[in-house]
């Protein structure tokens, strides 16, 4: 900082101190120290975070050490259950239940249209997730909920609607919406980690050629260019790995699962290329490269 009337480096200390903004200086110093020692702590403890750090400053001031606590989420340990067995059991049970429902409906002259005797993809994913043992880091759930809330706010703004109006229309409080998002986040994260572990356990692999073929099949002229981006390529790869796992399970179950036409499969591939990779997928890519 330069003080008027004094050459650089020759101004009295008391005048220099008066010209400075203490809050601004402290903020810059804290930011610099956190950035330096946070990275060092990760390397020293061999930690690979999958979330942004939650920083708490516990000591900072003149003539005292700078101390802070950084809380991060790491990939949880996942113990898979016998999901193929539980999926088969659920599929058999659903077929038996549907048979009874159809018999009852026929006797009562009701429609059979809404009675389904096949497992659907989301039910298979639920079984894989629910049969697994894992503990999802609270900080990761909070981060996911914050992302859902931000997305909701953006959607309301695009409709020229305030959040208060949305809440009144839904007859809900912000806390209730956040509670619903918390349940959704826990469910989605559980499924994500369980599927990733199942893919790893079954040694499912996706080649570069398969990723390129997916890009071509999407019908998007920009798709081949998009997969040159490492994050997009990793995201598409993860979608194809999941599809391979589910296809393998469906083939084993035979007629106990709902049919998926080639048209729907191509649609899913196209969507995988059009969707923007999430923060998690980018972090996972960094982790994979370590």
What residue spans do the PLM features occupy?
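FKBP-type peptidyl-prolyl cis-trans isomerases
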Residues: 1-290
């Amino acid at each position: 900082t330069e003080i008027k009337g004094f050459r650089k480096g020759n101004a009295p200390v008391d005048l220099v101190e008066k010209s400075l903004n203490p809050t601004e200086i402290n903020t810059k110093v804290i930011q610099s120290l956190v950035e330096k020692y946070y990275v060092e702590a990760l390397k020293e403890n061999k930690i690979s975070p999958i979330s942004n750090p939650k920083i708490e400053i516990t000591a900072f001031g003149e003539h005292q050490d700078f101390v802070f606590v950084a809380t991060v989420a790491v990939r949880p340990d996942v113990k898979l259950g016998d999901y193929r067995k539980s999926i088969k059991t659920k599929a058999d049970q659903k077929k038996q239940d549907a048979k009874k429902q159809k018999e009852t409906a026929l006797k009562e002259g009701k429609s059979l249209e809404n009675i389904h005797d096949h497992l659907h993809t989301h039910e298979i994913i639920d079984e894989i997730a629910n049969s697994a043992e894992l503990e999802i880091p609270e900080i990761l759930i909070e981060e996911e909920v914050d992302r859902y809330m931000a997305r909701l706010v953006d959607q309301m703004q695009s409709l020229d609607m305030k959040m208060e109006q949305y809440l009144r229309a839904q007859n809900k409080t912000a806390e209730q919406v956040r509670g619903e998002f918390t349940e959704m986040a826990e469910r989605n994260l559980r499924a994500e980690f369980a599927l990733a572990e199942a893919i790893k356990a079954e040694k499912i692999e996706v080649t570069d050629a398969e990723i390129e073929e997916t890009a071509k099949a999407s019908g998007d002229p920009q798709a081949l260019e998009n997969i040159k981006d490492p994050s997009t390529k990793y995201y598409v790869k993860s979608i194809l790995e999941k599809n391979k796992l589910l296809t393998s399970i469906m083939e084993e179950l035979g007629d106990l699962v709902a049919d998926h036409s080639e048209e729907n499969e191509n649609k899913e591939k196209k969507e995988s290329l059009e969707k923007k990779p999430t923060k998690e997928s980018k972090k996972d890519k960094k982790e994979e490269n370590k």
